[in-house]
């Protein structure tokens, strides 16, 4: 699925000023091509209420090429021609967003402010896909944790991580970066929470700190904002995002019923041999 090799990053101009716009990087009849997958994913996420009002986004890495949804586009109307493309390796020499070089830029949009956060998932976790949603269940979970933190004055860690165990859907998550297998039913899923900032790109350092502190996580919640989820490939990132949204909704409804997220349940051992 590797697209035609692009020209070097040095030969490409920045932002929307490309003289050769390299449209061949986003035009393909292959439905699994990143430039086709991102609009399809975003249209699906829009129907779920995850990316309303142009919020949220997605990015896919194919070897060195990174494909990104643009800023300000209505996600259900996105087309392959709207996709940005950049070289991941080139970012090491131009980390400043204002100097970021794109191999391919759409004419009518601006780069997503999520770009440095997506790049963090690719560089720090070798992810193949990163998804950002404004799921209202994710936001509600962060608000519940915020309320818990305010009621536990003096405990600085309260409200900074979402934890849940003994729920079947937890099996949808891997054990962590570089580890084999998935979490089990009795394991505890932990998703760190970072505080929101006025500008999306300013979240990057806090996202990276959360990755360092919780090396096994595949997601980071942003308080009053949404969630970032990444995976080895599109399939894993998508299914973990779906599993997380299920768990967030379940967690909110459990709180309404007075049920705890963390329980001590004895394993049921089969006796039949």
From Swiss-Prot:
Co-factor binding details: Binds 1 zinc ion per subunit.
Protein name: Methylthioribulose-1-phosphate dehydratase
GO molecular function: methylthioribulose 1-phosphate dehydratase activity; zinc ion binding
Enzyme class: lyase
Chain segments carrying region Disordered: 1-27
Keyword RNA-binding part of the UniProt annotation: no
Gene expressing this chain: MDE1
Entry GO CC: cytoplasm
């Amino acid at each position: 699925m590797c697209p035609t090799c692009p020209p070097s990053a040095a030969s490409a101009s920045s932002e929307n000023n490309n003289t050769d716009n390299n449209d061949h990087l986003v035009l393909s009849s292959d439905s699994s091509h990143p430039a086709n997958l991102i609009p399809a994913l975003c249209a699906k996420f829009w129907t779920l209420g995850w990316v309303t009002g142009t919020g949220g986004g997605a990015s896919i890495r194919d070897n060195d090429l990174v494909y990104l949804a643009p800023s300000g586009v209505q996600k259900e109307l996105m087309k392959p021609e709207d996709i940005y493309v950049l070289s991941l390796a080139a970012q090491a020499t131009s980390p400043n967003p204002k100097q970021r070089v794109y191999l391919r830029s759409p004419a009518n949009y601006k780069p997503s402010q999520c770009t440095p956060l997506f790049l963090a998932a690719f560089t720090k976790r070798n992810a193949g896909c990163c998804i950002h949603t404004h799921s209202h269940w994710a936001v509600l979970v962060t608000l519940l944790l915020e309320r818990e933190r305010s009621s536990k004055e003096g405990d600085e860690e309260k409200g900074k991580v979402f934890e849940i165990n003994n729920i079947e859907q937890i099996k949808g998550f891997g054990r962590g970066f570089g580890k084999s297998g998935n979490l089990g039913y009795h394991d505890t899923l932990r998703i760190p929470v970072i505080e929101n900032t006025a500008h999306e790109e300013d979240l990057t350092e806090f996202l990276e700190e959360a990755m360092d502190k919780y090396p096994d996580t595949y997601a980071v919640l942003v308080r009053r904002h949404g969630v970032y989820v990444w995976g080895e490939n599109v399939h894993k990132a998508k299914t973990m995002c779906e599993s997380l949204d299920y768990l967030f909704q379940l967690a909110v409804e459990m709180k309404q019923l007075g049920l705890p997220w963390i329980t001590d349940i004895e394993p049921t051992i089969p006796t039949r041999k």
